Amino acid sequence: MSRPLVFVTGNAKKLEEVVTILGNNFPAKLVSQSVDLPELQGEIEDICKKKCLEAAKIVQGPVLVEDTCLCFNALGGLPGPYIKWFLEKLGPEGLSKLLTGWEDKTATAICTIAYSSGDQNEDVILFQGQTTGKIVEPRGTRIFGWDPCFLPDGYDQTYAEMPKSEKNKISHRTKAVEKLRTYFTEKLNF
């Protein structure tokens, strides 16, 4: 790939996390670009594919688009892909209070990364990672979205309480990025 791979995001924290997880041996040059994409509704896979194709048209080249869901089991998967708006209106405290009337506090964090070569005739490829856990009252720093209220299974710290290095070993984003890295190193010629 002679052109750089554009990671479409305006979220500096997300970019920093992805670059850290990819490490120095990723075979493509990753650059970020903020692109005004439509906010779509639907299933996460469909949203990612459509956003990725639109981003590839705008950038006129290879792109990555990432979308994150936080699915509460008690609410049938909501907020799901709409977590951004729930978080903007409610904050981490409000997210945890959404489950006040339910015994089931379990949730799944899902990261879906979509890749397009830039060719509109080629399929978009998806890489998805999931981490299960539960929603708790916010603990830890408030610098990265809903991290303060997500407690991954098997841990006694929320994402926000963990050192970045620990979170980056187990997170939903890490699982998706590792699948992306494998695809790029094994399937594509760089």
UniProtKB/Swiss-Prot annotation:
It catalyses: ITP + H2O = IMP + diphosphate + H(+); dITP + H2O = dIMP + diphosphate + H(+); XTP + H2O = XMP + diphosphate + H(+). Homodimer. ITP binds at residues 9-14, 51, 67-68, 84, 144-147, 167, 172-173. This is Inosine triphosphate pyrophosphatase. CDD domains: HAM1. Binds 1 divalent metal cation per subunit; can use either Mg(2+) or Mn(2+). GO terms for biological process: deoxyribonucleoside triphosphate catabolic process; nucleotide metabolic process. Mg(2+) binds at residue 39. Signal peptide: none annotated. It is found in: Cytoplasm. One of its GO terms (molecular function) is ITP diphosphatase activity. Its EC number is 3.6.1.66. HAMAP family: HAM1_NTPase (MF_03148). Belongs to the HAM1 NTPase family. Pyrophosphatase that hydrolyzes non-canonical purine nucleotides such as inosine triphosphate (ITP), deoxyinosine triphosphate (dITP) or xanthosine 5'-triphosphate (XTP) to their respective monophosphate derivatives. The enzyme does not distinguish between the deoxy- and ribose forms. Probably excludes non-canonical purines from RNA and DNA precursor pools, thus preventing their incorporation into RNA and DNA and avoiding chromosomal lesions. It holds the Pfam family Ham1p_like. InterPro entries: ITPase, ITPase-like_fam, RdgB/HAM1. Keywords: Cytoplasm, Hydrolase, Magnesium, Manganese, Metal-binding, Nucleotide metabolism, Nucleotide-binding. Its cofactor is Mg(2+); Mn(2+). Its main location: cytoplasm.
